[in-house]
UniProtKB/Swiss-Prot annotation:
This is Sperm protamine P1. It is found in: Nucleus; Chromosome. Belongs to the protamine P1 family. One of its GO terms (cellular component) is nucleus. It comes from Gorilla gorilla gorilla (Western lowland gorilla). Protamines substitute for histones in the chromatin of sperm during the haploid phase of spermatogenesis. They compact sperm DNA into a highly condensed, stable and inactive complex.
Length: 51
């Protein structure tokens, strides 16, 4: 199954596709692209608050 991962950089709002990796990284990976996009936006918001 292909999973979508949340993008780490703020400039990119897109999420990239990712193959199944080790069980450790399973938490961050999302099953659908929409979920990944949500995760992405949430992270950006939290980062902005910190600064």
């Amino acid at each position: 199954m292909a999973r979508y991962r949340c993008c780490r950089s703020q400039s990119r709002s897109r999420c990239y596709r990712q193959r199944q990796t080790s069980r450790r990284r399973r938490r961050r990976s999302c099953q659908t692209q929409r979920r990944a996009m949500r995760c992405c936006r949430r992270r950006n918001r939290l980062r902005r608050r910190k600064h």
